[in-house]
C-alpha cells in the first residue's frame, strides 16, 4: 500500500529545488544577475564594432589569404587520399571540418616555433603587413608539405612498407583491391563476372598471385560473396583469407563447389561459417588436409563431432582459435578420429578447453612437426607436466613450438622437457615462449648450451621478464646465429648493451627491441653494422632512440618517437 511521506512546503526561501539551486542562491546573495551580465556584453560588443571600422581596408586581403590556405589544405588532403591505399568509401569520409582542422592542429613543436598562425583573420593596414602576409604564406606552404610528408612516412612505417618503389605486380594487385567494388557494379550492370572483367583488362590473375590478391582484399575489407568468385578456380590448391567477416555461409559452399581440389584452407574471422557450411566443406573437398579456422563460434559440439568423423584418416593439420564452442568433448573427438594422422595442431584462445592432458595420449605420429598452444583460459591448464609429456612424444621431430601465453610454465619445462627430449641437432625452426614470465636466464642458458639450433629461423621471447644478457648471448653463441631471420626481445627490461655486442647474425632481417630500456642511438648503429641483412627494427617505447641515430641504408626503424605525427 502506498504511504505518503511528509514533504516540506514549497515556496520557502532556502528551499533546495534541484542540483543548480545552490548556485542560484549564491548569485542572488552576491547581487549577480543576468541583466548586469547582458549590459556588460552589449558594451563590449559596441567597442568591438568601433574598432572594426579601422580594419575594413584589409578585409579583401584577409579573405584572399584565408581562401588560399583553405585551397592548399584541400589540395593536400586530395593528394594524400589519391596516393593512399584506402577504398573509395574510406576516401569519401573525409569531411570539410576535418580538412579545415589540419591548419591549426599539429603535433610538431618545431612548426609552432617557426610560425604562429592565428585562427582569426589577419588584418592588413600597411605595406609591412603585406610583406608579413607573404612570409606567412610561404611558411604555411612549407608546414603543409612537411605534414603531408610526415603522414606518408608514418603510414608507410606502420604498414611496414620499407621498399620505396613497389613492383608492377604489387601495384596491379593494389589497384584491383581498390577498384573491386566499382568493377562489381559495372559487372552487375553488364551481366559479366568480375573475373571476366579482370581477364579483359589485365589478362586475368595467375594462381600464384591469388593469395596476394586475397591479402589485399582482406586488408581493404572488400572480400565478400561477390569478390569471392575471383578465387573459384579448379586448379587452386592453397587459399588463405585473412578476413572472412563479409562472406556468408552460402559463399563457403560456393567455394567448396568450384574449388574442389583445395588441400590447404585458412579462414580467419569466419564468424558466418555455420554447421551446414562446415560439413559441406568436409564433403566437397576430398583432398583437404589442412584447415585453419579463426572465430567459428557458430559451430557446436555435435557439428564438430560429425566433421571429425568425415575427416577421419585424412586431416593432417588443424588449427582453431577464438571460439567458446570448441569444448573438451570436441577436442576429444578430434584426437580420437584424427589424432593418429595429425602432424600439426594449433589451439589458441579457446575458453572452453581445459583438458590439455589428452594431447600426449593421442599425438603419436612419428612425423608430427608443429605444436601451438596459446593463451589457455586457465593458466594452470597448461603446466610443466603436460608439456614435458608432450615433448616426450613429439620432441624428436618438432620443427615448430609455440607456447605463447602459457604463463604457468617454469624452468622445469625447459630443463626436463626441451633439453631432455629435443635431440642435440634438432630440426626446430620456430621457438616462441611469449609471456612466460617464470622462465629464467639459467634454464634457457643451459638449454642453448646443450642443444644445437642450427635450423632456428624465428625466435620470440616477448615479455619473458626474467631473461637477462646471458640467455641471449648463449643463444647467439649457438649455431642459431647463422640461421636466425626474426628475433623478438620485446619488453626484456633486464637486458643491457652487452647482450647486443654479440648480436651479429648474417641472415637476420627483423628485430623487435620495443620497451628495452638500454636501447639507444649507439645500439642501433652497432646493430646495423653487425647485421648486414637487417631491414626492420621495432623500437616502440625506446625513448633513448632519437632522430640522431645513425642508420645504414636499407635499415628502417619503426616506432621511433621522433617519427610520430
UniProtKB/Swiss-Prot annotation:
One of its GO terms (cellular component) is nucleotide-excision repair factor 4 complex. Residues 115-127 have a biased composition (Polar residues). The modification Phosphoserine is found at residues 64, 85. Disruption phenotype: Mutants with mutations in the RAD7, RAD14, RAD16, and RAD23 genes show partial incision defectiveness. The keyword DNA repair applies. GO terms for biological process: global genome nucleotide-excision repair; nucleotide-excision repair, DNA damage recognition; protein localization; response to UV; ubiquitin-dependent protein catabolic process. Keywords: DNA damage, DNA repair, Phosphoprotein. The keyword DNA repair applies. Disulfide bonds: none annotated. Residues 1-22, 41-68, 105-137 are annotated as: Disordered. It comes from the Eukaryota. InterPro entries: Leu-rich_rpt_Cys-con_subtyp (IPR006553), LRR_dom_sf (IPR032675). Residues 47-62 have a biased composition (Basic and acidic residues). Residues 1-200 are annotated as: Hydrophilic. To S.pombe SpCC613.14. Component of the global genome repair (GGR) complex composed of at least ABF1, RAD7 and RAD16. Interacts with ELC1. Present with 937 molecules/cell in log phase SD medium. Component of the global genome repair (GGR) complex which promotes global genome nucleotide excision repair (GG-NER) which removes DNA damage from nontranscribing DNA. This protein is one of 10 proteins (RAD1, 2,3,4,7,10,14, 16,23 and MMS19) involved in excision repair of DNA damaged with UV light, bulky adducts, or cross-linking agents. This is DNA repair protein RAD7. The gene is RAD7.
